[in-house]
Amino acid sequence: GFLDIVKGVGLVALGAVSKS
């Protein structure tokens, strides 16, 4: 659902921040 997409994007964003 929509919330699943939001959660997925949030996890990807956190992952990108952690890598940098």
Swiss-Prot record:
Name the Gene Ontology biological process terms. defense response
| The UniProt record lists the keyword Transmembrane | no
Where is the protein situated, by its record's location annotation?
Secreted
Q: Which domain of life is it from?
A: Eukaryota
- Keyword Secreted present in the record's keywords: the answer is yes
* Primary residence: secreted
Q: Which UniProt keywords apply?
A: Amphibian defense peptide, Antimicrobial, Secreted
Q: Tell me the tissue specificity.
A: Expressed by the skin glands.
Q: Name one GO cellular component term.
A: extracellular region
Tell me, in a sentence or two, what this protein's role is. Answer: Has antimicrobial activity.
Please state which protein family the record places this protein in.
Belongs to the frog skin active peptide (FSAP) family. Cruzioseptin subfamily.
Protein name, entry field = Cruzioseptin-15
Source species, please?
Cruziohyla calcarifer
